[in-house]
């Protein structure tokens, strides 16, 4: 007999149908395809270029700070909305790395237990039933999900190659603008790897003023850029009047499991975020925040990681070009975003990127992530594991990439 509890689930997560859906989502399909490929080719190495998680641990010096701070009696308790020492360090870091000036460490900065809850909480601060969030696609879905949970709707802004993967703000209709409260941006962008420009950020600021909305710029990959200097939305004139930027320690400092991020920018938005956060959590463990302070004081940790990804991405671009793909170095992140082929010379057909991605896993044992939201593309990550004797090894890195090249060049892909 079915439990009465089945009838109590909120509509936002499916109501009475919660847990009964038979839809198989993208990442579950990838997981199943990987399992099937391993069974079919048990002696063949599966090369995972789909996962978007750093391959290395946090720097040894960061771990040491955590250990030392964890031994201190004073650090045992709640931190609520964060230790002031971390808040004091954040503006110094943002000015040194990104040129952001005049950020108030008391009223314009708050830490978060990772960027995911930050995106969720800020959405709850502003969205009422009927409100609209402007959301770039493809992209990280948290803001869109929570907008819908609060009775709002999402207007998608496609990121197209012809526009350098920047949204066309001028194309948004007057009707949508009138109900919009949030413009969500993410640069450097996951999955496209695109970097925004100062010109675009200024357009976003002007757009926010003209339409009475806020900008949430998700800067999870902000410190991982190639070519140009890292760019912050908050470094643009008047940006602080309309929005906030969310920075994460996960990608820049190999601290995904540590769950530490911060929100910086407009005082009112930060205050609203802090009020909601205060009702959800009691702050990140103080020793983790102290380790975060050490990170911000040592940007050379990030530089070492950034250089590794740049080296790998450069090699991946060369390999993909040799296999027929139109691959280019990204502006930032650790991803390559390449157009999927429509088939192979020997007769295989791919209706979309998902079908190509499944082919790659099942036949070549190379895992990628497909995106069919705005064109047919696959994302390939440079954070694959390449260790030898417990250390990152360029020799092992080259072995893996040479194997990727061998498998890709065995096939003649057909492109539009």
Swiss-Prot record:
Native species of this protein? Methanococcus maripaludis (strain DSM 14266 / JCM 13030 / NBRC 101832 / S2 / LL)
Cellular localisation: Cytoplasm
Q: Name one GO biological process term.
A: lysine biosynthetic process via diaminopimelate, diaminopimelate-aminotransferase pathway
Drop me one GO molecular function for this one.
L,L-diaminopimelate aminotransferase activity
**Residue numbers binding pyridoxal 5'-phosphate:** 78, 115-116, 140, 190, 221, 248-250, 259
Protein family:
Belongs to the class-I pyridoxal-phosphate-dependent aminotransferase family.
Upon deletion of the gene, what happens? Cells lacking this gene are unable to grow in the absence of exogenous L-lysine.
Q: Which CDD domains match?
A: AAT_like
List of residues that carry N6-(pyridoxal phosphate)lysine = 251
Return the PANTHER family for the record: AMINO ACID AMINOTRANSFERASE, L-GLUTAMINE--4-(METHYLSULFANYL)-2-OXOBUTANOATE AMINOTRANSFERASE
Which PROSITE patterns does UniProt cross-reference here? AA_TRANSFER_CLASS_1 (PS00105)
Q: What is its EC number?
A: 2.6.1.83
Name of the molecule in the record:
LL-diaminopimelate aminotransferase
Cofactors (names): pyridoxal 5'-phosphate
Q: Which GO terms describe its cellular component?
A: cytoplasm
Q: How does it assemble?
A: Homodimer.
Residues binding substrate are 25, 52, 116, 140, 190
- Keywords, alphabetical: Aminotransferase, Cytoplasm, Pyridoxal phosphate, Transferase
Mind telling me which Gene3D superfamilies this protein's record contains? Aspartate Aminotransferase, domain 1, Type I PLP-dependent aspartate aminotransferase-like (Major domain)
**Role according to the record:** Involved in the synthesis of meso-diaminopimelate (m-DAP or DL-DAP), required for both lysine and peptidoglycan biosynthesis. Catalyzes the direct conversion of tetrahydrodipicolinate to LL-diaminopimelate.
Pathway this chain belongs to:
Amino-acid biosynthesis; L-lysine biosynthesis via DAP pathway; LL-2,6-diaminopimelate from (S)-tetrahydrodipicolinate (aminotransferase route): step 1/1
Catalytic reactions of this protein: (2S,6S)-2,6-diaminopimelate + 2-oxoglutarate = (S)-2,3,4,5-tetrahydrodipicolinate + L-glutamate + H2O + H(+)
């Amino acid at each position: 007999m079915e439990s009465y509890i089945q009838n109590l689930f909120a509509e936002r997560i499916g109501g009475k149908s919660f847990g009964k859906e038979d839809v198989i989502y993208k990442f579950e399909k990838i997981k199943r395809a990987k399992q099937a490929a391993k069974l079919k080719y048990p002696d063949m190495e599966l090369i995972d270029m789909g996962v978007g998680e750093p391959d290395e641990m946090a720097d040894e010096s960061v771990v040491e700070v955590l250990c030392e701070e964890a031994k201190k009696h004073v650090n045992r308790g709640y931190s609520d909305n964060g230790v002031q020492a971390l808040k004091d360090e954040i503006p110094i870091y943002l000015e040194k790395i990104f040129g952001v000036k005049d950020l108030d460490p008391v009223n314009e900065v708050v830490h978060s237990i990772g960027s995911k809850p930050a995106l969720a909480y800020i959405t709850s601060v502003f969205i009422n039933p009927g409100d609209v969030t402007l959301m770039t696609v493809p992209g990280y879905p948290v803001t869109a999900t929570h907008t819908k949970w609060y009775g709002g709707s999402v207007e998608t802004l496609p990121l197209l190659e012809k526009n350098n993967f920047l949204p066309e703000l001028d194309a948004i209709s007057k009707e949508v603008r009138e109900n919009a409260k949030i413009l969500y941006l993410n640069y450097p962008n996951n999955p496209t790897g695109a970097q925004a420009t100062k010109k675009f950020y200024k357009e976003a600021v002007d757009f926010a003023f003209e339409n009475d909305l806020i900008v949430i710029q998700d800067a999870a990959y902000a410190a991982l850029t190639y070519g140009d200097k890292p760019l912050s939305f908050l470094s643009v004139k008047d940006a602080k009047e309309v929005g906030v930027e969310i920075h994460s320690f996960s990608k820049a400092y190999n601290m995904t499991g540590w769950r530490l991020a911060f929100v910086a920018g407009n005082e009112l938005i930060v205050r609203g975020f802090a009020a909601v956060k205060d009702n959800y959590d009691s702050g990140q463990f103080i020793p983790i925040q102290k380790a975060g302070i050490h990170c911000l004081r040592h940007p050379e940790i990030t530089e070492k990681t950034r250089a590794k990804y740049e080296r790998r991405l450069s090699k991946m671009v060369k390999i993909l070009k040799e296999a027929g793909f139109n691959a280019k170095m990204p502006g930032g992140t650790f991803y390559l975003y390449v157009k999927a082929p429509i088939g192979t010379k020997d007769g295989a057909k791919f209706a979309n990127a998902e079908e190509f991605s499944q082919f790659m896993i099942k036949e070549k044992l190379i895992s990628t992530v497909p995106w069919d939201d705005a064109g047919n593309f696959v994302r390939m990550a440079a954070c694959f594991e390449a260790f030898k004797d417990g250390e990152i090894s360029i020799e092992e890195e080259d072995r893996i990439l040479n194997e990727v090249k061998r498998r890709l060049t065995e096939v003649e892909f057909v492109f539009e």
